């Protein structure tokens, strides 16, 4: 159920376009929300349908009964996809409200966000245990941010520059988290197949206040910094995994001793999003790195025996 494809109308305004949009909001407001179990069931059907569609397209001489079965899976998958999309259209509107006034109308933002939602439905991996809304929000925001750069009439900061800044910053932050120190321009360059000089140039652009405030949209109402989302430090999958890990680990912290709980919080960055090294935690407690490693190992073994063990296994092993 796409919104009216009429450009140039803000939500809450007057005229036919605004009336159509209000009608659209009323219609999607009547669509029941899904339970977590329903989301998983629909996601399974979507995955099966996509698999069946691929099989049908890649095999020339399928058994007739198998072809019928695959056709049925395709139909069921498309029905599930539609329901999963329609049940989350309100999420798109909610995200779109954060971007109003940056160069695109509410109608345009919702239209672009719906494309991101469709992509999220197609890419969603229910087996990982993520909340679909957490995962989909990243794709919706990505679609809207891209649209702001692509569709604004006056773009003085090229879209490819915005995207390159996001790529460099994303890799830089990921390497920082993995290694515990800020990577050099050479290390980032190797990862992105760029020259160190190009990486330094991009980093200078990202760090200069004037450059980050350079106008991107019309009437100078969109700045380059607006298009560098905080979430671009990680992909949708990585971010959803991080939040899921925090959610499940927090659920078992109350079963740990005070020191064990603090070690886990520091090690995984549960309090502030910044994981600490064994050395850093050792300095905080006034003990050796090896002692912290022993505490961590003992604590993780406890967590593996917890009711959430299956969900946590990918993070603790």
Swiss-Prot record:
Subcellular location: Cytoplasm
Gene: sigA
Alphabetical list of SUPFAM superfamilies matching this protein: Sigma2 domain of RNA polymerase sigma factors, Sigma3 and sigma4 domains of RNA polymerase sigma factors
Region (Sigma-70 factor domain-2): 84-154
Protein origin, superkingdom: Bacteria
UniProt entry tagged with the keyword Repeat: no
Name of this chain's protein: RNA polymerase sigma factor SigA
InterPro entries the UniProt entry points to: RNA_pol_sigma-70_dom (IPR014284), RNA_pol_sigma70 (IPR000943), RNA_pol_sigma70_r1_2 (IPR009042), RNA_pol_sigma70_r2 (IPR007627), RNA_pol_sigma70_r3 (IPR007624), RNA_pol_sigma70_r4 (IPR007630), RNA_pol_sigma_r2 (IPR013325), RNA_pol_sigma_r3/r4-like (IPR013324)
Keyword DNA-binding attached: yes
Keyword set, alphabetical order: Cytoplasm, DNA-binding, Sigma factor, Transcription, Transcription regulation
Pfam families: Sigma70_r1_2, Sigma70_r2, Sigma70_r3, Sigma70_r4
BP-aspect Gene Ontology terms: DNA-templated transcription initiation
Function noted in UniProt: Sigma factors are initiation factors that promote the attachment of RNA polymerase to specific initiation sites and are then released. This sigma factor is the primary sigma factor during exponential growth.
Subunit structure: Interacts transiently with the RNA polymerase catalytic core.
Ranges of the DNA-binding region feature: 278-297
Main location: cytoplasm
GO molecular function annotations of the record: DNA binding; sigma factor activity
Short motif (Interaction with polymerase core subunit RpoC): ranges: 108-111
Region (Sigma-70 factor domain-3): 163-239
Similarity section: Belongs to the sigma-70 factor family. RpoD/SigA subfamily.
PROSITE patterns listed in its UniProt record: SIGMA70_1, SIGMA70_2
UniProt region (Sigma-70 factor domain-4), positions on chain: 252-305
């Amino acid at each position: 159920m796409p919104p009216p494809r009429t450009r140039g109308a803000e939500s809450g305004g007057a005229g036919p376009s605004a009336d159509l949009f209000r009608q659209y909001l009323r219609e999607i407001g009547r669509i029941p929300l899904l339970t977590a179990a329903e989301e998983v069931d629909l996601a399974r059907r979507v995955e099966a349908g996509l698999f069946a569609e691929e099989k049908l397209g890649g095999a020339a001489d399928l058994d007739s009964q198998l072809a019928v079965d695959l056709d049925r899976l395709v139909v069921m998958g498309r029905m599930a996809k539609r329901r999963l999309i329609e049940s989350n259209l309100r999420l798109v509107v909610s995200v779109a409200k954060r971007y109003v006034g940056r160069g695109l109308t509410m109608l345009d933002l919702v239209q672009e966000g719906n494309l991101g939602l469709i992509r999220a439905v197609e890419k969603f991996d229910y087996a990982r245990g993520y909340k679909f809304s957490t995962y989909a929000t990243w794709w919706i925001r990505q679609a809207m941010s891209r649209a702001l750069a692509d569709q604004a009439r006056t773009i003085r900061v090229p879209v490819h520059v915005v995207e390159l800044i996001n790529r460099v910053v994303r890799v830089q932050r990921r390497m920082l988290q993995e290694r515990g120190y800020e990577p050099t321009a050479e290390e980032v360059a190797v990862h992105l197949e760029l020259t160190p000089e190009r990486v330094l140039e991009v980093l200078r652009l990202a760090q200069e206040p004037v450059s980050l405030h350079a106008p991107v949209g019309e009437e100078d109402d969109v700045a380059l910094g607006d298009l560098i989302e905080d979430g671009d430090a990680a992909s949708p999958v990585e971010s959803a995994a991080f939040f899921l890990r925090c959610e499940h680990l927090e659920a078992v912290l109350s079963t740990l001793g005070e020191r064990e709980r603090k070690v886990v919080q520091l090690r995984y960055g549960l309090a502030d999003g910044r994981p600490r090294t064994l050395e850093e935690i050792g300095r905080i407690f006034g003990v050796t790195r090896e002692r912290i490693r022993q505490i961590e190992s003992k604590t993780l073994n406890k967590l593996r025996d917890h009711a959430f063990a299956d969900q946590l296994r990918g993070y603790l092993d």
